[in-house]
């Protein structure tokens, strides 16, 4: 195949057929701001989009601006009271006497702060994932991408882990209108708890999560958590340790997913590509390269099953942009040049100005013995599944409605935290070389400072450089 400006063409797959790729992007997504010092920065999506454009990948994409999901769309999963709260809360309303009680009730305020435009941000994220599902349902695309989605921690009636609305659950519910079985795969460093919980009692959705397990947010995803009732054995959890590298990850991902595809035979697949599993992430503990991360997408693409690709975590924002740009290239079937094209954020990718970065020399605490034990345990679990469970087609698919807790309990019970509010960036900067103050991977949030030194960049939302370099 001929190469073009976007890179070297790749084989489309075992069938030799090119993939039609739909790409959802909301131009205002980078304007939303969680607040000073907060690790979650929607601006990373704009940076990824800039790379996608400058690599000319847009020429191979059908680009759509998502329709904003409305309250009724979001209410297909989330409780009416919670949706009403998200629609009405604002920084200006925080002085209302009832605000403090509702913030506690819905777990909003620290990990998940109230910021300007919060509900529109949620509507854009959810609208992109629902729109991606509609494209797949109508057979208008083979792969549908929404890097603004993948917010996997949100629950029916509460925010969690920087996530307010679970766009993934909403997208899967849309897919279930047309597809009998949907496979959800999560490669974020954090367990995909919100999605697993939503579908824990049904066999129409199988959830598979590869994540750091132990003293780490959200503290769920034990290998023995396998689902319940009709969904028993349709939740697969792959608990991992610090330092997971490309070779180790691939040695688990490929055989396990191959077995899942063989046994479950999904009619559609959703892949959450949280980039906090990359080497050097500020909140992550793994050591994956961009290519190692993208190998998961490459493997799933080869099956030629309708595929939704979503974003997720990722807090070293220049590496998030690199990763999601490269994975967009994998989706369309090209291998882009490692040398970055000049773009608005070019200086943020220094000093190497390359698409790929080397993993760190950190120790891989996942021993061969542990890996073999996990692989054998999960393959045995998969061997016991009924092949391709048949279901009566339902226009309203089953969603696990977790029992509402008494409001007093909701206000007082401790909530897990993904990030301590006392842990901040150096001078609230976006210098990706520096970890979060007060954050330690193995123990989660701490109060000790992890690094010292002056910052190279002091902008929470990096400003694009509109002036090209002089020749």
Curated annotation (Swiss-Prot):
Q: Does the keyword Heme apply?
A: no
Keyword vocabulary terms for this entry: Acetylation, Chromatin regulator, Hydrolase, Metal-binding, Nucleus, Repressor, Transcription, Transcription regulation, Zinc
Cofactor: record remark: Binds 1 zinc ion per subunit.
**Which residues are annotated as site, described as Polarizes the scissile carbonyl of the substrate?**
315
Position of the signal peptide: none
Q: What is its EC number?
A: 3.5.1.98
- EC class of the enzyme, as a word: hydrolase
> Domain of life of the organism in this record?
Eukaryota
In the record, N-acetylmethionine modifications are located at: 1
Which biological process, per GO, is one annotated for this protein? response to salt stress
Can you state which reaction this protein catalyses? N(6)-acetyl-L-lysyl-[histone] + H2O = L-lysyl-[histone] + acetate
Q: What is this protein called?
A: Histone deacetylase 6
Query: Its encoding gene is what?
Result: HDA6
């Amino acid at each position: 195949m001929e190469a073009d400006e976007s890179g070297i063409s790749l084989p489309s797959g075992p069938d030799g057929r090119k993939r039609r790729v739909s790409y959802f992007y909301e131009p205002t997504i980078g304007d939303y701001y969680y607040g000073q010092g907060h690790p979650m920065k929607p601006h990373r999506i704009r940076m990824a989009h800039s790379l996608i454009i400058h690599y000319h990948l847009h020429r191979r994409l059908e680009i759509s601006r998502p329709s904003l999901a409305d309250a009724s769309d979001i209410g297909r999963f989330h409780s009416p009271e919670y949706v009403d709260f998200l629609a009405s809360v604002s920084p200006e309303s925080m002085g209302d006497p009832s605000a403090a009680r509702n913030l506690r009730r819905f777990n909003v305020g620290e990990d998940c702060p109230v910021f300007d435009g919060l509900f529109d941000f949620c509507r854009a994220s959810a609208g992109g994932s629902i729109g991606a599902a509609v494209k797949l349902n109508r057979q208008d695309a083979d792969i549908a991408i929404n890097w603004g989605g993948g917010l996997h921690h949100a629950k029916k009636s509460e925010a969690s882990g920087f996530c307010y609305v679970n766009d993934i659950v909403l997208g899967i519910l849309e897919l279930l209108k047309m597809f009998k079985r949907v496979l959800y795969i999560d490669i974020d460093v954090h367990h995909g708890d919100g999605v697993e919980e939503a579908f824990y009692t049904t066999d129409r959705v199988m959830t598979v999560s590869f994540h750091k397990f132990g003293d780490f947010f959200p503290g769920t995803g034990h290998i023995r958590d396998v689902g319940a009732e009709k969904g028993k054995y349709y939740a697969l959890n792959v608990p991992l340790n610090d330092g997971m590298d490309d070779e180790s990850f691939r040695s688990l991902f490929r055989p396990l997913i191959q077995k899942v595809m063989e046994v479950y035979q999904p009619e559609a697949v959703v892949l959450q590509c949280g980039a906090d599993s990359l080497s050097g992430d500020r909140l992550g503990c793994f050591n994956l390269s961009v290519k190692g991360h993208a190998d998961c997408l490459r493997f799933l693409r080869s099956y030629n099953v309708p595929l939704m690709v979503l974003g997720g975590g990722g807090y070293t924002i220049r590496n998030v942009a690199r990763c999601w740009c490269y994975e967009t290239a994998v989706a369309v079937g090209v291998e882009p040049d490692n040398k970055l094209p000049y773009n608005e954020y070019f200086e943020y990718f220094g000093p190497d100005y390359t698409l790929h970065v080397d993993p760190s020399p950190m120790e891989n605490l996942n021993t061969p013995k542990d890996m073999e034990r996990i692989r054998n345990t999960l393959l045995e679990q998969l061997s016991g599944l009924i092949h391709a469970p048949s279901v009566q087609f339902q226009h309203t698919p089953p969603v696990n409605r977790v029992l509402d807790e008494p409001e007093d309990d909701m206000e007082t019970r401790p909530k897990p935290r993904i990030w301590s509010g006392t842990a901040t960036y150096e001078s609230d900067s976006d210098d990706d070389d520096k970890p979060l103050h007060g954050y330690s991977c193995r123990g989660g949030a701490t109060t000790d400072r992890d690094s010292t030194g002056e910052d190279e960049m002091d902008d929470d939302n990096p400003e694009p450089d509109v002036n090209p370099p002089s020749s």
